Amino acid sequence: MLKPLGDRVVVRFDDEKEQTVGGFVLAGTHKESTRKATVLAVSETGVRTITGDSVLPSVSVGQEVLVENGHDLEVTVDDEKVSIIRESDIIAIVTK
């Protein structure tokens, strides 16, 4: 697994697929402005303020979050597609 640095977070997007009558699986055809994801890893160091204090990420592993669409770097690790995002691109934590 990846170990993110600074204000970065590793997530897996929970993309829903649509299935047609013929059984073909298609990715969603219309783009949402946000995407739901599960947090897989967060930075252990956070970012430093101008005074040198460390600000740790406010999300934790396992949480579901909403992320602005298009603000991710997709990578493949151990045959799994994951994305690296900045914590500031997370707009909400999903609660149940």
UniProtKB/Swiss-Prot annotation:
Q: Where in the cell is it found?
A: Cytoplasm
Please indicate if the UniProt record lists Kinase as a keyword: no
| Molecular function terms from GO | ATP binding; metal ion binding; protein folding chaperone; protein-folding chaperone binding; unfolded protein binding
Q: Which SUPFAM superfamilies match?
A: GroES-like (SSF50129)
Its Gene Ontology cellular component terms are: cytoplasm
What PROSITE patterns would the database entry show?
CHAPERONINS_CPN10
Highest taxon of the lineage:
Bacteria
* GO BP of this protein: chaperone cofactor-dependent protein refolding
Q: Which UniProt keywords apply?
A: Chaperone, Cytoplasm, Stress response
Lyase as a keyword?
Answer: no
Report the InterPro entries cross-referenced here.
Answer: Chaperonin_GroES, Chaperonin_GroES_sf, Chaprnonin_Cpn10_CS, GroES-like_sf
Protein function: Together with the chaperonin GroEL, plays an essential role in assisting protein folding. The GroEL-GroES system forms a nano-cage that allows encapsulation of the non-native substrate proteins and provides a physical environment optimized to promote and accelerate protein folding. GroES binds to the apical surface of the GroEL ring, thereby capping the opening of the GroEL channel.
The entry assigns this protein to a family as follows: Belongs to the GroES chaperonin family.
Give the protein name, as stated in the record: Co-chaperonin GroES
Organism name:
Streptococcus pyogenes serotype M49 (strain NZ131)
